[in-house]
Amino acid sequence: MATAAFTPWILGLTGGIGSGKSAAAERFVELGVHLVDADQAARWVVEPGRPALASIVERFGPGVLQADGQLDRAALRQLIFADPAQRKWLEQLLHPLIGQEIFSYLAKAQSPYAIYVSPLLIESGQYHKTQRVLVIDAPQELQIARTLARDNTSAEQVQAILQAQLAREERLRHADDVLVNDGDLAALHEQIDRLHHFYLTLKGGQP
């Protein structure tokens, strides 16, 4: 008799800018969990030669390309943050393509559960394709301070990004688990280790 194919359950991991999603994701990887980041998938679908990049250039012009033909993400970001209609168009183009890349990749995972990391997990509706949602949460002033320390950006740009993202309360409403990341890295790792051991006991993301 053939053995049934192994299929991991999928944990959606999300949080606002500067909440600590990347640090949390790194710890899960250290623990052996198969993970894909929406930002990685977003880069895959706009590589030179892919249809999505051609559509973006047709919409916004050649100014969104670097000299080597790669997408100039900073130039595109400036165009869409000031224009909600353009941002919506871009999201409608990319989200289905990114979802296809992500869930094809996650289906091949060999860990008991796999993680999909996305800042837009709720807004895009992709959380419907996960079995459980983990929200990384942090006070807004800490989100701003972390982002300013990490990125070459202004406080005004960070505020604009925060305002464009889903309201914190709405994100938390969709959470099965909440990790408050308001301490140091060791405290974050301790919380993740506990969650990981809990997740290993779940079947299909449920107790």
From Swiss-Prot:
Compartments it resides in: Cytoplasm
Job of this protein: Catalyzes the phosphorylation of the 3'-hydroxyl group of dephosphocoenzyme A to form coenzyme A.
Lineage: Bacteria, Pseudomonadati, Pseudomonadota, Gammaproteobacteria, Pseudomonadales
Single annotated GO MF: ATP binding
Disulphides: none
Catalyzed chemical reaction(s): 3'-dephospho-CoA + ATP = ADP + CoA + H(+)
Cellular component GO terms, alphabetical: cytoplasm
UniProt similarity note: Belongs to the CoaE family.
Superkingdom of the source species: Bacteria
Protein name per UniProt: Dephospho-CoA kinase
GO process annotations (BP): coenzyme A biosynthetic process
Keyword Transferase tagged: yes
Keyword match Nucleotide-binding: yes
UniProt keyword list: ATP-binding, Coenzyme A biosynthesis, Cytoplasm, Kinase, Nucleotide-binding, Transferase
Pathway: Cofactor biosynthesis; coenzyme A biosynthesis; CoA from (R)-pantothenate: step 5/5
Domain DPCK: 10-207
Pfam families membership: CoaE
Binding-site residues for ATP, renumbered to this chain: G18, S19, G20, K21, S22, A23
EC id: 2.7.1.24
Organism: Pseudomonas putida (strain GB-1)
